[in-house]
Amino acid sequence: MQIKVDTKEKFTTITPVEPKIYVNMAAELTGICDGILLKETKNVILNLQPVSDIEDGAAELIAKLQQKFYDANASFVICEIKPAVEEVLEKLELLELLNVTPTESEAWDIVQMEEIERELLDDGDVEFNTNE
């Protein structure tokens, strides 16, 4: 599977180069993402802009991959999906389960908001000032 990888401070963007994602390609993507989960910066944005078709099994693997990231306290956001890919996800009843944004910029925002949320939830000593 040919992909472009762009690592930023808070996340890594993965963009497949091929126009169709097959099951074996999604399995390879899972292996790549498993490696990212071991790094300090473990949030992923999957940019599907070049992808015009996806096999059912590949879509299911990507949904499982997203859950693996959230179970590991990391973000996994999919962006720029084309209508044909969206139809496959909808048919498999996965679209509502996935964290999908129209643009990569919005995906960045989601990752940053989830990072802030995790920081707040991890800080068990949250104090509220009730002085009036």
What are these regions (language model features)?
Residues P102-E127:
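A charged, well-structured terminal subsegment
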Residues D6, C79, T101:
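General small-molecule cofactor/ligand-binding pocket signal
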Residues M1-T13, I45-A58, A107:
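Charged, low-complexity, helix/coiled-coil-prone segments
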